[in-house]
């Protein structure tokens, strides 16, 4: 999966 932010997913 890809998140718009380079942070840990919720």
Curated annotation (Swiss-Prot):
Q: Where are the transmembrane segments?
A: none
Keywords, in A-Z order: Pyrrolidone carboxylic acid, Secreted, Toxin
- Chain positions with Pyrrolidone carboxylic acid modification: 1
Cellular localisation = Secreted
Question: Tissue expression, per UniProt?
Answer: Expressed by the venom gland.
Recorded GO CC terms: extracellular region
An example Gene Ontology molecular-function term? toxin activity
Q: What does this protein do?
A: Bradykinin-potentiating peptide. It inhibits the activity of the angiotensin-converting enzyme (ACE) by a preferential interaction with its C-domain. It evokes transient hypotension.
Describe the family membership recorded for this protein in Swiss-Prot or TrEMBL. Answer: Belongs to the bradykinin-potentiating peptide family.
- What is the designated name of this protein? Bradykinin-potentiating peptide-like
Q: Which organism is it from?
A: Bitis rhinoceros
**What is this organism's lineage?**
Eukaryota, Metazoa, Chordata, Craniata, Vertebrata
